[in-house]
Regions:
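Short, small-residue-biased leader/transition segments that mark boundaries at the very start
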Residues: 1-8
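Structural motif
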Residues: 8-9, 65
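Catalytic palm subdomain of template-directed nucleic-acid polymerases
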Residues: 12-45, 122, 126-127
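A conserved non-catalytic segment of reverse transcriptases
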Residues: 45-119
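Non-catalytic, peripheral interaction segments enriched in hydrophobic/basic residues
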Residues: 110-156, 160-164
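Extended C-terminal regions of large enzymes
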Residues: 144, 149, 153-220
Length: 220
């Protein structure tokens, strides 16, 4: 509280959540001065220890705060928030676990768990700018699910039958089913993108990241 009062007294722009705080100034010189003053105040007046490994002077692009990173929007002439690269990597890792082909659960259960992950992640990062990221992650999730579905179909005969049900020509379905290539390669082919497309996966119950983000986004 006293740290907050000090920032207000000195007319410093700051954001604070629990014991995490960002103080914003216009120059590196000002930043170093504020860093010294705040650190001295915390240690000498409050009797607390400042963790210097987590405290630093940096530009907005170099910050990670509560899972967010920052970038400069040249059109809006201001800095904006987005999910930090480490947060994105953590999401991708969890998504990969939920779409593991060797995980012995049904694909509908995988979709259920994916939806929980997607909704929770976007609900948290909804103030960030991430339309392009959501589209990229959407495509990745669909690709991973195609591999799960292709493996579930197992036999060439079953794959031909299911591809034809999804509107694929019989000859193309036969060639695809008997291609002998690895699952990862088959599921990158155009025929698979057509057969198991975004609309069909949504019908199967999958939440589209870009659609959900567009509904939730407060800055769009």
């Amino acid at each position: 509280r006293r740290q907050r009062q000090m920032c207000i007294r000195d007319r410093l722009n700051f954001v604070r959540y629990a014991d995490d705080c960002i103080i914003m100034v216009r120059s590196e010189m000002s930043a170093n001065r504020v860093m010294r003053n705040i650190s001295r105040f915390i240690e000498e007046k409050l009797g607390l220890k400042v963790n210097m490994t987590k405290s630093k002077v940096d530009r907005p692009q170099g910050l990670k705060y509560l899972g967010f990173g920052f970038y400069f929007d040249s059109r809006a002439h201001q800095f904006k928030a987005k999910p930090h690269a480490k947060s994105v990597a953590k999401f991708k890792k969890r998504m990969k676990e939920l779409t593991c082909r060797s995980w012995g659960v049904s694909n509908s259960y995988k979709v259920e768990k994916l939806n929980q992950l997607i909704r929770g992640w976007i609900n948290y990062f909804e103030i960030g700018s991430m339309k392009t990221l959501c589209k990229e992650l959407d495509a990745r999730i669909r690709y991973r699910l195609r591999m799960c579905i292709w493996k579930q179909w197992k036999t060439p005969q079953n794959r031909i039958k299911n591809l034809m049900k999804l509107g694929v020509d019989k000859d193309i379905a036969w060639i695809t089913a008997y291609t002998g290539s690895r699952i990862a390669y088959v599921c990158q082919r155009r025929v698979m993108n057509f057969a198991i497309n975004k609309e069909r996966l949504i019908q199967f119950g999958l939440v589209s990241m870009i659609d959900y983000y567009t509904k939730r986004c407060v800055t769009c």
